Amino acid sequence: MDILKNKIVINELFEKGKYLSNGSVMIKFLESDSNGFLFAVSSKKFKRAVDRNRIKRLMKESARKINVNNKRIAFVYIGEGLPTFEIINNSINNLLSKIWS
């Protein structure tokens, strides 16, 4: 699993990418020659870094098993309150099934 770190690549993903959303997770995705993931949680909604890091770890674990070819995907948590792994996993799987169908 490759993590997106280049600012130019991230800006291109958010400017040109398409998005899907449900109640707790938003996904921005863009077809490209390489693949990579980005995980984000708003610091306005979650003041403590411990909470933000936990949510990002849950999203990473859910996305770890995904085999993506030639897509850059940003996972942004937009829900309220601390989620469980089941909530994150179901949200991400539902959104990814919409991308590939």
Segments (PLM) and residue ranges:
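Positively charged, solvent-exposed patches that mediate nucleic-acid binding
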Residues: 1-101
